Amino acid sequence: MDKLQKTLEEWKEMLDPAQYSVCRLKGTERPFSGKYNDTKTAGVYHCICCNEALFDSTTKFDSGCGWPSFYAPLEGSAVVEVRDVSHGMIRTEVVCARCDAHLGHVFPDGPPPTGLRYCINSVCLELVPRE
């Protein structure tokens, strides 16, 4: 996969303010506010910044946390996990492997088979429905 690199100004021009704030400045959308929180549509979730395929709807589950949750990313290297020590916490940030967009965080409290919960901001995603 080829890395996609742009300046912050270039990202700012192509993203709406909410997308830019979360994806490029590592913000977080308010819980239960995202368009994909309750979505049950079958398909593949892509990065809003670079269109890289990230998560399949078959791994999405209702965690009750207020953000779309998945128990695994797509096979391969769709996402990268990065140690995050911001806000006085130690967490694992999830970023797009292609463009380094901040997507959310992963926690060790998910369902089988992985036991992981990828807690992802809706604003970072674009769902491509299955036909």
Swiss-Prot record:
The keyword Protein biosynthesis does not apply. Binds 1 zinc ion per subunit. The zinc ion is important for the structural integrity of the protein. It comes from the Bacteria. Residues 8-130 form the MsrB domain. Its cofactor is Zn(2+). One of its GO terms (biological process) is response to oxidative stress. GO terms for cellular component: cytoplasm. Coiled coil: none annotated. Keywords: Metal-binding, Oxidoreductase, Zinc. This is Peptide methionine sulfoxide reductase MsrB. It comes from Pseudomonas syringae pv. tomato (strain ATCC BAA-871 / DC3000). The lineage of its organism: Bacteria, Pseudomonadati, Pseudomonadota, Gammaproteobacteria, Pseudomonadales.
